[in-house]
Curated annotation (Swiss-Prot):
<comment type="similarity">
    <text>Belongs to the shikimate kinase family.</text>
</comment>
<feature type="binding site">
    <location>
        <position position="83"/>
    </location>
    <ligand>
        <name>substrate</name>
    </ligand>
</feature>
<dbReference type="GO" id="GO:0009073">
    <property type="term" value="P:aromatic amino acid family biosynthetic process"/>
</dbReference>
<keyword id="KW-0067">ATP-binding</keyword>
<comment type="subunit">
    <text>Monomer.</text>
</comment>
<keyword id="KW-0963">Cytoplasm</keyword>
<feature type="binding site">
    <location>
        <position position="122"/>
    </location>
    <ligand>
        <name>ATP</name>
    </ligand>
</feature>
<keyword id="KW-0028">Amino-acid biosynthesis</keyword>
<dbReference type="GO" id="GO:0008652">
    <property type="term" value="P:amino acid biosynthetic process"/>
</dbReference>
<keyword id="KW-0547">Nucleotide-binding</keyword>
<keyword id="KW-0808">Transferase</keyword>
<dbReference type="InterPro" id="IPR031322">
    <property type="entry name" value="Shikimate/glucono_kinase"/>
</dbReference>
<dbReference type="GO" id="GO:0005524">
    <property type="term" value="F:ATP binding"/>
</dbReference>
<dbReference type="GO" id="GO:0005829">
    <property type="term" value="C:cytosol"/>
</dbReference>
<comment type="pathway">
    <text>Metabolic intermediate biosynthesis; chorismate biosynthesis; chorismate from D-erythrose 4-phosphate and phosphoenolpyruvate: step 5/7.</text>
</comment>
<dbReference type="InterPro" id="IPR027417">
    <property type="entry name" value="P-loop_NTPase"/>
</dbReference>
<dbReference type="InterPro" id="IPR000623">
    <property type="entry name" value="Shikimate_kinase/TSH1"/>
</dbReference>
Length: 179
């Protein structure tokens, strides 16, 4: 199967390793890594938690949709998406049509460990929620959407970002052209 598209999109729940693997993919391919949440923060001058607080999740998702639309117009990029990017049909369509979609998975315990290590328990969907239960709930809702979009799927529980990035590139080259 050939897919003549040059962007690589990383999808999955928070703590799945999208940014870590994306950073290694960017180094190996000499491409620019974009993180959609960080790009939203740059554009607005506000952090994601503040946007959620002031505009609610709907306001954040609107900003996310605009950012995804802009980033999908670029070529030869690596994009680590926000975990909820799949909730919007337009996002799913644009991402699927403009690149190879890599779904990174991890156990809930691994995700919690990674999120805690990064000091990211302030994430908007964690505030006022039991973290483990919230991740399980998010996974139940989003997993079918991630799976439907995914061209390739990788578990990251025993993550070595460099090795996984190398394997992803090998698999992409074996499966698709022009990447």
């Amino acid at each position: 199967m050939k897919k003549d598209l040059t962007n690589i999109y990383l999808i999955g729940l928070m703590g799945a390793g999208k940014t870590s693997v994306g950073s290694q993919l960017a180094k190996l391919t000499k491409r620019i890594l974009y993180d959609s949440d960080k790009e939203i923060e740059k554009r607005t001058g506000a952090d994601i938690a503040w946007i959620f607080e002031m505009e609610g999740e709907a306001g954040f998702r609107r900003r996310e949709r605009e950012m995804i639309e802009a980033l999908c117009k670029l070529d030869n990029i690596i994009l680590a998406t926000g975990g909820g990017v799949v909730l919007d049909e337009k996002n799913r369509q644009q991402i699927s049509e403009t690149g190879v979609v890599i779904y990174l998975t991890a156990s809930i315990d691994t995700q919690l460990k990674r999120i805690g290590q990064k000091g990211e328990m302030r994430r908007p969907l964690f505030i006022k929620n039991n973290s483990k239960e919230k991740l399980q709930q998010l996974n139940e809702i989003r997993k079918p959407l991630y799976q439907a979009m995914a061209d390739l799927v990788y578990p990251t529980d025993d993550l070595n970002p460099r090795q996984l990035a190398t394997q992803i590139l090998v698999d992409i080259k074996q499966t698709y052209s022009d990447l």
